[in-house]
Amino acid sequence: MNTIELKELPRQYKNNGQHAEQVARYTLTGEVCKADNKPFTAGGDCGDIQIKSARATICRGTDIKAHIAIDGAKRYGYVNSSYTVMYLMNADEWFEFASLFGTVTRESKANGGAIKMRLKAEGREMTEWLRARA
């Protein structure tokens, strides 16, 4: 696992995941563009990197490995809650991270009520796990 120090970018989105993606993309490419503008099977949010942050949806259902197999990304970036560091992981590291820090929830009834996995809120245990492997 590697880390990338992120550049500061004025916030354009209330949604934390969209802001995390935009900050990471700006750091990596210098571009400021609309977040969530690519389907998850397109290979990644920025190049071959799928970018996530705390409380992000990991996958529909509970099969993380199946999602990894079809999402098209080669690397996974977790942006910390202060938007200052992105932890860059390969698929095996991402699977371990998502398995440890994912939780099963349901979509709202208005959205069909399907089961999905989300990352937990960032806490001390998650931060220590990331730092120990970076």
Residue ranges and their predicted role:
Residues M1-A134:
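Nucleic-acid endonuclease domains
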